[in-house]
Amino acid sequence: MPQTFTSIAKIGDYILRTPALAKVVVPIAHQFINLSGYRKMGLRFDDLIEEENELAQTALRRLPADESYARIYRIINAHQLSLSHHLLPKDKWTKPEDDIPYLTPYLLEAEAFVKEKEELDNLEVAK
């Protein structure tokens, strides 16, 4: 079964609501984020979402223009840093409080729209 953004969000909410799971998983997640290094290149987590699928394209079209331009700038800057094998200075790294999901709400909205459309397309009228 392929993972959907909705199922991933529900799993994350469940983990955060369960104290025992949160106590174990959250520190591991923070360490994973630190080791992945995307914040050291000025990226935010939603910048890493694959944009080659229809759902992501829909979410990107719904993104406000200023956020879209900022996203493109961060990605281009990260590519340049990658090509030159450098990282940003520590004061320019993305801070955890700045790494908020800006694309995820649009992805969830687009996914709900696709699901609703599919349900309506397959609707059978009973008499």
Curated annotation (Swiss-Prot):
Pfam families: UCR_14kD. SUPFAM superfamilies: 14 kDa protein of cytochrome bc1 complex (Ubiquinol-cytochrome c reductase) (SSF81524). One of its GO terms (biological process) is mitochondrial electron transport, ubiquinol to cytochrome c. Keywords: Electron transport, Membrane, Mitochondrion, Mitochondrion inner membrane, Respiratory chain, Transport. InterPro entries: QCR7 (IPR003197), QCR7_sf (IPR036544). It is a peripheral membrane protein. It is found in: Mitochondrion inner membrane. The keyword Membrane applies. It comes from the Eukaryota. One of its GO terms (cellular component) is mitochondrial inner membrane. Belongs to the UQCRB/QCR7 family. Component of the ubiquinol-cytochrome c oxidoreductase (cytochrome b-c1 complex, complex III, CIII), a multisubunit enzyme composed of 3 respiratory subunits cytochrome b, cytochrome c1 and Rieske protein, 2 core protein subunits, and additional low-molecular weight protein subunits. The complex exists as an obligatory dimer and forms supercomplexes (SCs) in the inner mitochondrial membrane with cytochrome c oxidase (complex IV, CIV). Component of the ubiquinol-cytochrome c oxidoreductase, a multisubunit transmembrane complex that is part of the mitochondrial electron transport chain which drives oxidative phosphorylation. This is Cytochrome b-c1 complex subunit 7. It comes from Kluyveromyces lactis (strain ATCC 8585 / CBS 2359 / DSM 70799 / NBRC 1267 / NRRL Y-1140 / WM37) (Yeast). The gene is QCR7.
